[in-house]
Design a protein with these regions (language model features):
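N-terminal pre-Walker A segment at the start of P-loop NTPase domains
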Residues: 206-241, 284-300
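Short helix/loop capping segments that flank catalytic or ligand/cofactor-binding pockets
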Residues: 63-64, 139-142, 206-209, 253-255, ...
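Intrinsically disordered, low-complexity regulatory segments
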Residues: 110, 115, 181-184, 188, ...
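Glycine-rich phosphate-binding P-loop
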Residues: 240-268
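N-terminal accessory targeting/assembly segments
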Residues: 1-194, 205
Length: 300
């Protein structure tokens, strides 16, 4: 593995050369507290950005082991770190100038769901974060001075502010993991009680619009019919009450614009856990469930 200083020298040696000279940067580099891997280099500044990976060993990141000791906690932490890295790196996107996609810093988009993603992976050795960078050029002539800014100024700040425990608010991390553990408790209770779904009272089910998955402002909170109400004791939040849907055939009935489709869509998405503030944090559906549309001669 080469040292960061060697990368810096290589960058300066290829400045103003033809764009394909960037290909020689592919490889692994040791920075003071982390390792940088340039895994794929784009063919020209207008092509898809180059693929990079950063590895931070646990000895440097120093997140408590209890944050990632089991899969549930680990997925929650991975999701939180990826969102934080994406938020901070967005501030530096296109700060380096050039043609085409020069200066872009891009991370996989995180929606409202908490998912296991390859963009952030916690292993026994440490934290891996995968992202894309547009290597800068003027036309098709290398501008390695701008890439040097990205690799030696912007990225170290992104890593420091998002992947080191000392820089991530403790309370924020605790809340993410506690929510994930409470969601797991509800999933376990569904199986024990013979239920297929749970919708907590107070949940915000409507979305802002048809092309947005964000919660609608000033929406009417969900309230379960008394006949279907159940209470579940959670690990961190305490008891929570809402609607339990049993296995079998359930008919959603009501007048026009009364929220039938909204409830059905929330149940459909309930196979995934959602982030705090989404409104559907405690809308939980059996993770083996799937949605089928009605069609002529389809038998269900």
């Amino acid at each position: 593995m080469k040292m960061a200083e060697e990368l810096q020298r290589e960058l300066r040696s290829i400045n103003r050369k033809s764009y394909p000279a960037y290909k020689g940067l592919k490889g692994a580099y040791q920075f003071p507290d982390y390792q940088l891997f340039i895994e794929h280099v784009q063919g020209d500044p207008f092509a898809a950005p180059s693929a990079l990976r950063i590895f931070v060993p646990h000895s440097k990141a120093k997140f408590p082991e209890r944050y990632y000791w089991d899969k549930c906690s680990k997925v929650a932490l991975q999701d939180a770190l990826l969102r934080r890295f994406a938020e901070i790196s967005a501030k530096f996107c296109y700060q380096a100038k050039g043609s085409g996609k020069s200066g872009v810093i891009q991370v996989s988009h995180c929606g409202q769901e908490v998912l296991e993603r390859t963009a952030c992976e916690i292993t026994k050795e440490g934290i891996h974060i995968r992202f894309f960078v547009g290597f800068p050029a003027n036309g098709r002539t290398i501008n390695s001075g701008e890439l040097e800014k990205i690799l030696f100024v912007y990225l170290p700040k992104c890593v420091e502010m998002s992947l080191y425990h000392r820089k991530v608010p403790e309370r924020e991390t605790e809340q993410v993991i506690c929510l994930k553990e409470d969601q797991r408790v509800i999933r376990e209770e569904l199986k024990k009680r013979g239920l297929i779904a749970f919708v907590a009272n107070g949940s915000i089910l409507p979305r802002q619009s048809g092309n947005s998955d964000l919660p609608m402002k000033d929406a009417v909170p969900f309230q379960s019919p008394k006949s279907m109400e159940i209470t579940i004791q959670l690990r961190h939040r305490g008891s929570i009450t809402g609607m339990g849907i049993r296995k079998g055939i359930t008919l959603i009935a009501g007048g026009g614009y009364h929220g039938k489709s909204t409830l059905l869509e929330a149940l459909e998405k309930g196979v995934y856990d959602h982030i705090a503030g989404d409104g559907r944090e405690f809308v939980i559906t059996d993770d083996t469930a799937s949605k089928l549309r009605a069609e002529d001669v389809r038998k269900i």
